[in-house]
A protein has these predicted regions:
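Carbohydrate transferase catalytic cores enriched for Leloir-type hexosyltransferases
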Residues: 1-374
Length: 374
């Protein structure tokens, strides 16, 4: 009997880890239908968004809880104590208070450990405590890149033999080249986006280095002079450190050319990505970095920070700059405007690179880690 914590996957308005959990669960359903094991999805609310469609050997356990916190440590722990299971998979970096000996945890990155000043102090404390617990008690850890696996091993003394690598995937049914120009134009009108533009996707927070991007874009525009048509579009909800981003935008001499879209539903994102001159991903730290791969799948060139796992994930299919060097980024933006052949080359290379990353292949790597003890 294998249990999966599904509260993240069951959230509306999903971002990173929530989409990761949702996609892996959906792929595991297909891979394990009738496999002889019983699979249980634990959640605090009725399963929705496709999660509720369960194969015969899959079950839902709903544990109601009135508070926005404490579900993992109280009702979920109590359920695991009352009804024993063989294996538990936690898709996010946390453990319940009570859990089976064979518990597997996915750790996406440890940016909070390497760059704590980019996180809320309380979040750093919570994550550090959780990671120490995981290091001591988890049977296996799943990492989303070789880089992240090494980081986890070195920082918390976890034997590398306990760490399994399963690269993230992307939804190729959603993120793909869009040939329907009218549909693209309709989305651009809806979000009031004018071409040409550079695009950044992700939570608008300190660790994503958006303030530096705004500063670089401002310098880029000033140098190109009056009448330059390029815009900067920021897509994603606000996060920790947004005040600095807001201040940088307010102080920019080209703030009228900077558009904040906030959260954009998955169904609309590919249309905006496809229309972008390039995606810029300036993050200080990433365990994997899904938005650049989604952009590549849409045929959009990528300019990325060379930090952490990003060169491992994208190889030679992107242009790279140091996240501390806005001048390097400005140079890359200029190159993609002045060298159309380079843009075509990156688009072609990106399309091929994106094919490597599927949720099915990720689930196929995770499945044997979960079933070896079942």
């Amino acid at each position: 009997m294998i249990g999966i914590e599904a509260t993240r996957a069951n959230k509306p308005g999903k971002t990173g880890v929530e989409w990761y959990a949702w996609h892996i669960i959906q792929e595991l359903k297909t891979l394990t239908a009738g496999d002889g094991n019983s699979w249980i999805l634990y959640s605090n609310k009725p399963l929705t968004g496709g999660l509720e469609k369960l194969p015969e050997n899959w079950y839902e356990v709903r544990l109601k809880w009135p508070l926005p916190y404490g579900w993992t440590q109280i009702p979920f722990s109590y359920e695991l104590h009352r009804h024993k299971i063989d294996v538990l998979w936690m898709p996010g970096s946390t453990l319940p208070r009570i859990f089976p000996a064979k518990t597997v945890v996915t750790v996406h990155d440890i940016g909070f450990h390497r760059l704590p000043h980019l996180y809320k102090k309380r979040q750093v404390h919570i994550h550090e405590r959780a990671m120490k617990e995981i290091a001591k008690k988890a049977a296996r850890v799943i990492s989303v890149s070789e880089f992240s696996g090494r980081e986890i091993s070195e920082a918390y003394g976890i034997n590398s033999n306990k760490i399994a690598i399963a690269y993230n995937g992307i939804d190729h049914g959603t993120y793909k080249q869009i040939k329907d120009g009218d549909a693209v134009e309709e989305r651009l009108r809806r979000y009031r986006v004018n071409q040409p533009f550079f695009l950044a996707i992700g939570r608008q927070e300190a660790k994503k280095n958006i303030a530096m991007l705004v500063k670089a874009f401002t310098q880029f525009k000033v140098r190109r002079g009056v009448g330059d048509p390029f815009k900067l579009v920021l897509m994603g909800p606000q996060g920790f450190g947004y005040e600095d981003i807001k201040r940088e935008i307010a102080n920019s001499s080209v703030k009228s050319d900077i558009l904040e879209l906030g959260y954009v539903p998955e169904v609309d994102k590919p249309y905006i990505i496809s229309a972008a001159h390039a995606l810029i991903h300036p993050a200080f730290y990433e365990g994997f970095g899904i938005p650049p791969i989604e952009a590549m799948a849409c045929g959009t060139p990528v300019i990325s920070s060379n930090a952490a796992s990003l060169p491992e994930i994208m190889g030679d299919a992107a242009l790279y700059f140091s996240p501390e060097e806005p001048e390097q980024l400005i140079g890359m933006m200029d190159r993609l405007i002045q060298e159309p052949n380079l843009r075509t080359t990156l688009s072609t290379a990106g399309l091929e690179m994106a094919k490597r990353y599927t949720w099915k292949s990720a689930a196929e790597k995770i499945l044997p880690v979960l079933t070896r003890w079942a």
